[in-house]
Amino acid sequence: MASYLYGVLFAVGLCAPIYCVSPANAPSAYPRPSSTKSTPASQVYSLNTDFAFRLYRRLVLETPSQNIFFSPVSVSTSLAMLSLGAHSVTKTQILQGLGFNLTHTPESAIHQGFQHLVHSLTVPSKDLTLKMGSALFVKKELQLQANFLGNVKRLYEAEVFSTDFSNPSIAQARINSHVKKKTQGKVVDIIQGLDLLTAMVLVNHIFFKAKWEKPFHPEYTRKNFPFLVGEQVTVHVPMMHQKEQFAFGVDTELNCFVLQMDYKGDAVAFFVLPSKGKMRQLEQALSARTLRKWSHSLQKRWIEVFIPRFSISASYNLETILPKMGIQNVFDKNADFSGIAKRDSLQVSKATHKAVLDVSEEGTEATAATTTKFIVRSKDGPSYFTVSFNRTFLMMITNKATDGILFLGKVENPTKS
C-alpha cells in the first residue's frame, strides 16, 4: 500500500483596533480567578510571556528595521493545541519550544492552563471586545482520532469543519472567509496556495477592540509631526496629544520610559521608549519578570504625551522561524502526528501568522526580587512630564485577568501600513 505524506497548514489570524462595539454573547461559565498563583494557569501565563519575547527577538533578527506586530498568545495556543496530536520528539519539541520543563510540568497541567487561558479570553465584557477562537478544517476522508477531536473541542473550544480539499481553491476561499468573518474583515486572504496534499488546516484568530479609558481629542492631533526613522530619515505623521494622569516610570537599568495607558475594560497598553541607541539593550532584557516589574512599579503622574496615530500590519511564515527556536520536527518528514490521524502521515507544511493593528484617538483595534530602580519625578518639579513617541518604540497590549501579552510590536515607521 502506498504511503502518502499530507500537509497540515497552521494559520494564525489576528487583528487589533479600539472602537465602541457590542459585547460578544458568549456564556460566562468560566469566571476569571482572583489569583493565579501556583496554578497551571499562572505558569502558562508566565511562560507565554517569555515565549512572546523570545519570538519577538527572533522576528527582529528575521525582519530588521521593519515594523513588527504579532499575537504571541495566538501562536502559543495554536502550538499547544497541535501538540495534543503529536507524539515522541514532535510533542517534546513543541512543548519545550513553548518554554515548558516536561520533567517538572505534566502535560495535563499544560493543557489545563491553556484551557483556563482560552476561557479567560472569551468572557464577554460590555467595555471591550476580545474574541479568540480556533478552527480545524479537516480533509473529509481523514479519520481523526477520537481522543484528539474531543480534547481540541473540550480544552481549546475549537470548531471542526469537514472540508473537501480535492478543490483547493474552494477550500481556500472557505477558510479565508471564516477568518475574515471572525476578525471583522481585518484579516483577509491569510491562506494561499493550498494543494491536493493538504489534509488539515488549523486556524487560530484573535480580535480585540477597545476604547481608551482616557481618549485623545482629535482636535489636538498634530497633522504633520516629525518622526525619526532609523538615525537619519524623518517622516511626518499625525501625532495624538493630551495631558493627563497616567502610570509612568523611568527604568534606569534598561534606559527607557514606560507609559501605561488603560483601556475601558480588562486590557492595558504599554508604550516603551528607549533612550537613543538603547533599543537592542532593551530588547535583549525583555522577559516576564521585566513586564511584572513595570506593572508593579509605575506610578501615576501628570504626563504630556505624544503618540502617533497609525495602522500597521505584519505577516510571518512561521515554518522558517519556529525551527530556529527548537520547534523543527513539526515541519519535516519525521513529524509524528499519529495522535491526530492514525493511518496517515502528517506534517505541518506551512505556518502563517498575520496581524493588523490600528491605534487612534478613540482607542485600539488589533486582530500575549529586582534591584532595578524606577524614577518618578518629584512633585516639586514641573507640573507634568513630557514624553514624545517620535522615534522607534515598543507597544504591547496585555490582559489584566491573565497578565498575558495579547499583542506585541515595534513601531519603526508608523507611515508604513
Swiss-Prot record:
Species of provenance: Homo sapiens
Signal peptide start and end residues: 1-23
CDD domains: serpinA9_centerin (cd19556)
Family from the record: Belongs to the serpin family.
Name listed for the protein in its UniProt record: Serpin A9
InterPro entries (UniProt xref): Serpin_CS, Serpin_dom, Serpin_fam, Serpin_sf, Serpin_sf_1, Serpin_sf_2
Domain of life where this protein originates: Eukaryota
GO molecular function: serine-type endopeptidase inhibitor activity
Known glycosylation sites: N101, N390
Keywords annotated in UniProt: Cytoplasm, Glycoprotein, Membrane, Protease inhibitor, Secreted, Serine protease inhibitor, Signal
Function: Protease inhibitor that inhibits trypsin and trypsin-like serine proteases (in vitro). Inhibits plasmin and thrombin with lower efficiency (in vitro).
GO cellular component terms listed in the entry, alphabetical order: cytoplasm; extracellular space; membrane
Tissue: Highly expressed in normal germinal center (GC) B-cells and GC B-cell-derived malignancies.
